[in-house]
C-alpha cells in the first residue's frame, strides 16, 4: 500500500456501519424499558430524565460496576445473553441497599472488533435486567478500539441512578441495634463475584461443562446463571415493613459486605445451617479444597441480599418477601460486639 492510497476508518479497524447496525438492533430493546420520566429517545448527546413528582425531597443515588472475570467464562462458553443482566444487577442492587428506586441505567461496551450479534446479545441481557429493575436503559456507549482487546473479547461497565425520599433513605449504621433479626434472600448462584476463583477451580478440575450438574441444568448453565435482581420485590416490602439495613452480597462475601452497614458496636451472627447452600458452592469447595472461612469471604454461598429488621417485624417482612416471590430465610441476629471481634460471624 503506497502513501497515496486512500485510507478509511474501516481500514483502521473501526466499522461505522456495524456500529449503526447495532444501534438499530438496540433501539427496540431499549424502548421496552421506557418508564415515566424519560424525555426523548436513544441517539442524543445526552439523555433527559425527570424525577417523579411524588418525591417531596428527592435524593439521587448512583452506582457503577462491571461483571468482572465472569466475562472470561462468557467468552470461553460463547454465552453472552446473561452477562448484561449481571451488569445491571450489580449496580441496581447496590443502590437498593440505600432504599433507592432505580430510575435509569447506562452501559459501556468496549471491544477490539465489533461483532453485532454478540453485542446485541449482551445488550439484550442489559435490557432484560432493566425491565426486572423497573429502570430505563436511557443510553450507552459502544467503543470499537482496534488493538485494545483480543478478538472475540469485550469489557462492560454499567451506571445506575436511582432516587429515594430523603427521610426514607436507609442507613443501617444509624438504625441497627442488638436484638434485630437478619434475613437472607436467596441468590441464583455465584452472581458476578469470585469468578477468578471459580475459573481456577474449573481449570484444576477440568469438568465437562455441558454435563448435567444440578437437575436438568449443566455446569455451564449454573456458573453463567444471571445475578438475581431484588429491586421491585424489596421496594414493595418497604411499603409495608421498616427495613433497618441491607447489604448486597458481592465481592467479599457475607464476611466483608454485612459489616459495611453495621454500627461499630454490633455483630451480625449468622447460622450457616439456616439456609440451603446451592450445590455449586459445595462442588467448588470440594474441588478447590477451599476453606470454609474463605468460602464466606469470597462467595455469597446462597445469600444474595441481607436485610436487617426489628425482631417484631421479622415475620411480616418474611411473609411479604415470600409474597413477592423471594426465597427468604431467617439467618441470624444482631448482638453487641465484644472488643475488636469481627463484625460478621458465620457459625
Curated annotation (Swiss-Prot):
GO terms for biological process: 'de novo' IMP biosynthetic process; adenine biosynthetic process. Belongs to the AIR synthase family. Pathway: Purine metabolism; IMP biosynthesis via de novo pathway; 5-amino-1-(5-phospho-D-ribosyl)imidazole from N(2)-formyl-N(1)-(5-phospho-D-ribosyl)glycinamide: step 2/2. Its main location: cytoplasm. It is found in: Cytoplasm. It comes from Dechloromonas aromatica (strain RCB). It holds the Pfam family AIRS_C. The keyword Ligase applies. InterPro entries: PurM-like_C_dom (IPR010918), PurM-like_C_sf (IPR036676), PurM-like_N (IPR016188), PurM-like_N_sf (IPR036921), PurM_cligase (IPR004733). It comes from the Bacteria. Its EC number is 6.3.3.1. The gene is purM. CDD domains: PurM. PANTHER family: TRIFUNCTIONAL PURINE BIOSYNTHETIC PROTEIN ADENOSINE-3, TRIFUNCTIONAL PURINE BIOSYNTHETIC PROTEIN ADENOSINE-3-RELATED. GO terms for cellular component: cytosol. It catalyses: 2-formamido-N(1)-(5-O-phospho-beta-D-ribosyl)acetamidine + ATP = 5-amino-1-(5-phospho-beta-D-ribosyl)imidazole + ADP + phosphate + H(+). This is Phosphoribosylformylglycinamidine cyclo-ligase. One of its GO terms (molecular function) is phosphoribosylamine-glycine ligase activity. Keywords: ATP-binding, Cytoplasm, Ligase, Nucleotide-binding, Purine biosynthesis.
Amino acid at each position: 500500500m503506497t502513501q497515496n492510497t486512500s485510507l478509511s476508518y474501516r481500514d483502521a479497524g473501526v466499522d461505522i456501519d456495524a456500529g449503526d447496525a447495532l444501534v438499530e438492533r438496540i433501539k427496540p430493546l431499549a424502548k421496552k424499558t421506557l418508564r415515566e420520566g424519560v424525555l426523548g429517545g436513544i441517539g442524543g448527546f445526552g439523555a433527559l430524565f425527570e424525577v417523579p413528582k411524588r418525591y417531596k425531597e428527592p435524593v439521587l443515588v448512583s452506582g457503577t460496576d462491571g461483571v468482572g472475570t465472569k466475562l472470561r467464562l462468557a467468552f470461553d462458553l460463547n454465552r453472552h445473553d446473561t452477562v448484561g443482566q449481571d451488569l445491571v444487577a450489580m449496580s441496581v442492587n447496590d443502590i437498593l441497599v440505600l432504599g433507592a428506586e432505580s430510575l435509569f441505567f447506562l452501559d459501556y461496551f468496549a471491544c477490539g472488533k465489533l461483532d453485532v450479534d454478540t453485542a446485541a446479545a449482551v445488550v439484550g441481557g442489559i435490557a432484560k435486567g432493566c425491565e426486572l429493575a423497573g429502570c430505563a436503559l436511557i443510553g450507552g456507549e459502544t467503543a470499537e478500539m482496534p488493538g485494545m482487546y483480543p478478538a472475540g473479547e469485550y469489557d462492560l461497565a454499567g451506571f445506575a441512578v436511582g432516587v429515594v425520599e430523603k427521610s426514607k433513605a436507609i442507613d443501617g449504621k444509624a438504625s441497627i441495634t442488638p436484638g434485630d433479626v437478619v434475613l437472607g434472600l436467596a441468590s441464583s448462584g455465584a452472581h458476578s463475584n469470585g469468578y477468578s476463583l471459580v475459573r481456577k477451580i474449573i481449570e484444576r478440575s477440568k469438568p465437562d461443562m455441558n454435563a448435567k450438574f444440578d437437575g436438568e441444568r449443566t455446569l455451564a448453565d449454573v456458573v453463567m446463571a444471571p445475578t438475581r435482581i431484588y429491586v421491585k420485590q424489596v421496594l414493595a416490602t418497604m411499603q409495608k415493613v421498616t427495613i433497618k439495613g441491607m447489604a448486597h452480597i458481592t465481592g467479599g462475601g457475607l464476611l466483608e459486605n454485612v459489616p459495611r452497614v453495621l454500627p461499630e458496636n454490633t455483630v451480625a451472627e449468622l447460622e450457616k445451617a439456616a439456609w440451603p447452600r446451592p450445590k455449586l458452592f459445595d462442588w467448588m469447595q470440594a474441588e478447590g479444597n477451599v476453606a470454609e472461612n474463605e468460602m464466606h469471604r469470597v462467595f455469597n454461598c446462597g445469600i444474595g441480599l441481607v436485610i436487617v429488621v426489628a425482631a417484631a417485624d421479622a415475620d411480616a417482612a418474611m411473609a411479604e418477601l415470600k409474597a413477592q416471590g423471594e426465597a427468604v430465610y431467617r439467618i441470624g441476629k444482631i448482638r453487641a460486639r465484644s472488643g475488636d471481634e469481627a463484625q460478621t460471624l458465620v457459625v
